[in-house]
Regions:
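Contiguous beta-strand/loop segments that form the cofactor/metal-binding neighborhood of enzyme cores
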Residues: 198-284, 316-337, 354-357
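Mid-domain beta-loop-alpha active-site segment that forms a flexible
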Residues: 123-130, 160-224
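C-terminal glycine/acidic-rich active-site capping loop/insertion
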Residues: 168-197, 268-341
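Beta-loop-alpha module in the N-terminal Rossmann-like domain of NAD(P)-dependent dehydrogenases
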Residues: 50-112
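A contiguous active-site-proximal alpha/beta segment in oxidoreductase catalytic domains
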Residues: 101-179
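C-terminal helix-rich "cap/oligomerization" subdomain common to oxidoreductases
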Residues: 61, 71, 118, 327-362
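Hydrophobic residues in well-ordered beta-strands that form the structural core
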Residues: 95-96, 120-122, 278
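N-terminal Rossmann-like dinucleotide-binding module
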Residues: 1-50
């Protein structure tokens, strides 16, 4: 099997918890050539644990000096500038979600990937969860979808509290930059045309954890809605949206937070012939499958006054979605005709919908 030589940009929580351990496990597919983080001491400690030979404190330096890179994984907070530089050089590029924070940036990245031929893939790992994939298959079998509801409600720290490893993450020295100091809030303000604290807070959550659910919802119903209305709470921590489609389908999106320690992430579709519920597992619980429930009436039979309702439950496999995602990226890099399931173009369409929701919010 061909090994892909990768550089890692960003050594934070998701890199340490998921990407680096699975890249190391997949050593028959990947060679980690170098790491970079703006906190070089952090990068050196992480590199020592994973036996990575080269460490840099800037992505520019990594891209300029590491020879023969096939691909990069961009795992920092704002992916646009390093992704653009990598794609311009024809380097296959994986970014964590979101791809970027503005529609214009997304269009530029997609256009650059098309021009240079480099693959651009976005880390919506839930699309590589076998339970999610089965749930989407079941939804496509619905003859006439009538209503859908996607909701994500999470407890403290976005549900990350659930695993003890979170306490052992190696942190950078000093205070970490937040969205207000690293430029992301300024980009959000420019897209919205407002400095409303509630909308800016909702923007960060929409482009953060909620973007997974927009992506799954769009996987089920790719067509752009013909009407969008939304409401946001005064603190920006809760947002509801109603999406109307040309065929009569109505979708409700709900994103929110709670102080209760829970993680709820579901997509339910009610159709003319069946109801499909997809219950997505907490991504920080490794090898825990997502679950699909399908309810439908049996065909009528003689001697029965009315059909019976049957419910089927299907659990996904215990194969880890983060690992499956990396295997897919490897396949895309090494197979010229294979395009990413969660491509840059798909992410651009997600961003268009997310912005439509946020701009309609009151």
């Amino acid at each position: 099997m061909s090994r892909v030589r990768v550089g890692i940009l960003g050594c934070g929580m998701i890199a340490q918890l998921m990407h680096l351990p699975y890249l190391t496990e997949l050593e028959d597919r990947f060679e980690i050539a170098a790491l970079c983080d703006q906190d070089k001491a952090l990068a050196q400690r992480v590199a020592a644990r994973h036996r990575v030979p080269r460490v840099h404190d800037s992505w520019e330096n990594l891209l300029d000096t590491v020879p023969s890179l096939d691909a990069v994984l961009i795992l920092n907070k704002d992916h646009f500038a390093p992704a653009l530089m990598a794609l311009e050089r024809g380097i296959h590029t994986f970014t964590e979600k979101p791809l970027c924070y503005t529609q214009g940036e997304a269009e530029q990245l997609v256009g650059t990937a098309e021009r240079t031929g480099a693959k651009l893939m976005v880390g919506y790992m839930k699309r590589y969860d076998s339970g999610v994939r089965r749930g989407l298959e079941e939804m496509r079998r619905i003859s006439a979808p009538r209503m859908a509801r996607a909701h994500i409600v999470v407890g403290p720290d976005y549900g990350n509290w659930i695993i003890p490893e979170i306490q052992r993450i190696d942190r950078p020295a000093g205070a970490e930059a937040d969205s207000g100091t690293d430029g992301r809030t300024a980009k959000a303000r420019g897209e919205l045309g407002t400095g409303s604290p509630a909308l800016l807070a909702a923007y960060m959550d929409m482009f953060g954890v909620w973007s997974h659910d927009i992506n799954v919802l769009r996987a089920a119903f790719p067509a752009a809605p013909t009407s969008v209305t939304a409401r946001v709470s005064p603190d920006g921590g809760t947002l509801t949206a109603l999406l109307g489609h040309a065929d009569g389908l109505q979708c409700v999106f709900l994103g929110g937070k709670t102080s209760v320690r829970l993680f709820e992430e579901n997509l339910t579709v009610w159709g003319s012939d069946r109801v499909v519920e997809l219950h997505i597992s907490n991504p920080f619980l490794r090898h825990v499958p997502s679950t699909v429930r399908v309810r439908q009436d049996e065909a009528p039979s003689s001697g029965r006054p009315r059909p019976l309702t049957v419910e089927r439950t299907v659990d996904g496999s215990h194969h880890e979605a983060f690992k499956a995602q990396l295997c897919h990226f490897h396949a895309c890099v090494t197979t010229p005709e294979l395009q990413p399931l969660t491509s840059g173009q798909e992410s651009l369409e997600d961003i268009r919908l997310m912005l439509a929701i946020l701009r309609s919010a009151r």
